[in-house]
Amino acid sequence: MDDREELLAGIKAKGIMHGDFELSSGAHATSYVDLRRVTLDGRLAPLVGRVLLSATANLTYDAVGGLTLGADPVAAAMLHAAANRGTPIDAFVVRKAEKTHGLQRRIEGPDVTGRRVLALEDTSTTGSSVLTAVDALKAAGAEVIGVAVIVDRGARQRVLDRGLPYIAVYELDELGI
């Protein structure tokens, strides 16, 4: 079993819940993909990093991250996987709002000004979270070269309409829901 297949099995085993769920978009779903159960799992997180690095291998970027909280463990997994390959990248966290104390930053981590960055999300239904991060990154002077997610729940066209490449490791139908 390769990394992509092993990660998919892990998502199916640990990341899919059934019931009535309200998504961050306000929409309702009978199944919920809770990828924090995957991206924060000690066995599966390294797979997340390796699989996303492979999926985005045709893009050139030197930092990854997105809107807190879904993107945070994804960025950390990619940071560690890249370092293990000998090709380090930086990670950053985009806050939902600028801090009102301390350094009053919206984007935490290494400065993204003038850097080629990849915006991340664990799963995306409408694209709102990742596009909020994209807007903050552009406002900070970053060059956003694309968006990558583990599971696409329907955000692809909205991201593409913004002129950004969109990489999804899995489509919803691959999860069997």
Give the positions of each predicted feature.
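Conserved acidic residues
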Residues: 62, 115, 145
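Conserved acidic carboxylate
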Residues: 121
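Short glycine-rich phosphate-binding loop at a beta-alpha junction
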Residues: 59-70, 148-149
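Short, well-ordered alpha-helices that flank and scaffold nucleotide-derived cofactor binding pockets
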Residues: 50, 54, 76, 80-84, ...
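PRPP-dependent phosphoribosyltransferase catalytic core
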Residues: 3-10, 134-177
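Active-site-facing substrate-recognition patch
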Residues: 1-59
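Short, glycine/charge-rich flexible loops or terminal/linker lids adjacent to PRPP-binding catalytic cores
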Residues: 75-118, 126-131
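Short acidic, glycine/proline-enriched helix-loop-strand junctions
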Residues: 58-59, 75-89, 156-172
